[in-house]
């Protein structure tokens, strides 16, 4: 659990963020023969030949990583709260989470083969075009400088928890086959707010074709509450009811 007290993470980068226009420049980074195009970054990135994610060192390493992520998230949340930018930085993190959810982007920025200066350049371009808060941009540079950019997803999760606690916000994850209309999401959020009594409700959307149709709703501090309105569940129930595996047919 993230705490706002006794945080040790420093949020000062030794590098001053530079702003560039991502729409006019598309540099090609000559790092290997494996190339991919990131529409989010508007860049062609050359991937290192080997994946180099940070080793967690087992359960102890995972625990230490979780504690570090909590410290970074709490420090940033404390700073954002004091500057009245909690909502803005949370919106920034939604975009960052979407970017780093691409495994190729994550592996690229996690690789020690890629120069930190190159990572900062790309992050600077993404921050500029996305309109990030200065604190958000600086925070990403801090993670690059400290070789902990590979913790970004864990940090976002921890920050989200702290934000929800500070603002009495319920996070609702809605998964559907196709993108739902905004008024449908508003109706779902309103119902969850009635169920939980939360002051505010934030919705995140995911797409999952395996649901066939309909949607699922997950909420609660750890996502423990689950509402399944998908056709997939209905089909599974029907299949269970007509299972003939144990029936002996007369010959």
From Swiss-Prot:
<comment type="subunit">
    <text>F-type ATPases have 2 components, CF(1) - the catalytic core - and CF(0) - the membrane proton channel. CF(1) has five subunits: alpha(3), beta(3), gamma(1), delta(1), epsilon(1). CF(0) has three main subunits: a, b and c.</text>
</comment>
<comment type="similarity">
    <text>Belongs to the ATPase delta chain family.</text>
</comment>
<feature type="transit peptide" description="Chloroplast">
    <location>
        <begin position="1"/>
        <end position="64"/>
    </location>
</feature>
<keyword id="KW-0809">Transit peptide</keyword>
<keyword id="KW-0406">Ion transport</keyword>
<dbReference type="GO" id="GO:0046933">
    <property type="term" value="F:proton-transporting ATP synthase activity, rotational mechanism"/>
</dbReference>
<dbReference type="Pfam" id="PF00213">
    <property type="entry name" value="OSCP"/>
</dbReference>
<dbReference type="InterPro" id="IPR026015">
    <property type="entry name" value="ATP_synth_OSCP/delta_N_sf"/>
</dbReference>
<keyword id="KW-0139">CF(1)</keyword>
<keyword id="KW-0934">Plastid</keyword>
<dbReference type="GO" id="GO:0009535">
    <property type="term" value="C:chloroplast thylakoid membrane"/>
</dbReference>
<keyword id="KW-0150">Chloroplast</keyword>
<keyword id="KW-0472">Membrane</keyword>
<dbReference type="InterPro" id="IPR020781">
    <property type="entry name" value="ATPase_OSCP/d_CS"/>
</dbReference>
<keyword id="KW-0793">Thylakoid</keyword>
<keyword id="KW-0066">ATP synthesis</keyword>
<dbReference type="InterPro" id="IPR000711">
    <property type="entry name" value="ATPase_OSCP/dsu"/>
</dbReference>
<dbReference type="GO" id="GO:0045259">
    <property type="term" value="C:proton-transporting ATP synthase complex"/>
</dbReference>
<keyword id="KW-0813">Transport</keyword>
<comment type="function">
    <text>This protein seems to be part of the stalk that links CF(0) to CF(1). It either transmits conformational changes from CF(0) into CF(1) or is implicated in proton conduction.</text>
</comment>
<protein>
    <recommendedName>
        <fullName>ATP synthase delta chain, chloroplastic</fullName>
    </recommendedName>
</protein>
<keyword id="KW-0375">Hydrogen ion transport</keyword>
């Amino acid at each position: 659990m993230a705490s706002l007290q006794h945080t040790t993470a420093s949020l000062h980068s030794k590098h001053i963020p530079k702003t560039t226009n991502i729409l006019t420049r598309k540099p090609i980074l000559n790092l290997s023969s494996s190339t991919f195009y990131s529409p989010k970054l508007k860049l062609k990135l050359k991937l290192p030949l080997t994946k180099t994610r940070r080793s967690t060192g087992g359960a102890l390493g995972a625990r230490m990583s979780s504690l570090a992520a909590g410290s970074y998230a709490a420090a940033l949340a404390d700073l954002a709260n004091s500057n009245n930018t909690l909502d803005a930085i949370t919106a920034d993190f939604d975009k960052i989470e979407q970017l780093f959810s691409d495994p190729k982007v994550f592996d690229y920025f996690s690789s020690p083969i890629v120069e930190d200066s190159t990572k900062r350049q790309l992050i600077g371009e993404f921050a500029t075009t996305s309109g990030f808060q200065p604190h958000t941009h600086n925070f990403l540079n801090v993670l690059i400088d400290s070789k902990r950019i590979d913790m970004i997803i864990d940090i976002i999760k921890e920050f989200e928890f702290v934000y929800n606690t500070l603002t009495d916000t319920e996070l609702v994850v809605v998964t559907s086959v196709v993108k739902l209309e905004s008024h449908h999401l508003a109706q779902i959020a309103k119902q969850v707010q009635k169920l939980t009594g939360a002051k505010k409700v934030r919705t995140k959307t995911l797409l999952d074709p395996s649901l066939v149709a309909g949607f699922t709703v997950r909420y609660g501090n750890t996502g423990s509450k689950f509402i399944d309105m998908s056709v997939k569940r209905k089909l599974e129930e029907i299949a269970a009811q007509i299972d003939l595996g144990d029936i002996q047919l007369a010959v």
